[in-house]
Amino acid sequence: MDSHTVSSFQDILMRMSKMQLGSSSGDLNGMITQFESLKLYRDSLGEAVMRMGDLHSLQHRNGKWREQLGQKFEEIRWLIEEVRHKLKTTENSFEQITFMQALQLLFEVEQEIRTFSFQLI
């Protein structure tokens, strides 16, 4: 896993946790939770790829890992749409920068997960 991506996740999560978006704070908390879940999933896939022959362990631990992979891509798409919506509706420059960085990070993580999953297939 790229150390830049780790710091990006931490930075974006920290920035998002400081935002006050009024009535949509529940939505923001949901986004933060999804980001954290996505980071953990991406990390576990990356670790599985790093260990040779770990595909069997991954399949044994989670027989439906391909289904789970599909669900994670759905979560990424949902997060991308949510971040795009927040980006369009906010006028605060701090929030705009944060959401632009979050969007970029989501695209990077989606690509990393695709790469990891192709290596495991």
UniProtKB/Swiss-Prot annotation:
It comes from the Viruses. Its main location: virion. It is found in: Virion; Host nucleus. GO terms for cellular component: host cell nucleus; virion component. GO terms for biological process: exit of virus from host cell nucleus through nuclear pore. The keyword RNA-binding does not apply. The keyword Chloroplast does not apply. A motif (Nuclear export signal) lies at residues 12-21, 85-94. Keywords: Host nucleus, Host-virus interaction, Transport, Virion. It holds the Pfam family Flu_NS2. Belongs to the influenza viruses NEP family. Interacts with protein M1. May interact with host nucleoporin RAB/HRB and exportin XPO1/CRM1. Mediates the nuclear export of encapsidated genomic RNAs (ribonucleoproteins, RNPs). Acts as an adapter between viral RNPs complexes and the nuclear export machinery of the cell. Possesses no intrinsic RNA-binding activity, but includes a C-terminal M1-binding domain. This domain is believed to allow recognition of RNPs bound to the protein M1. Average number present in a viral particle is estimated to be 130-200 molecules. This is Nuclear export protein. It comes from Influenza A virus (strain A/China:Nanchang/11/1996 H1N1).
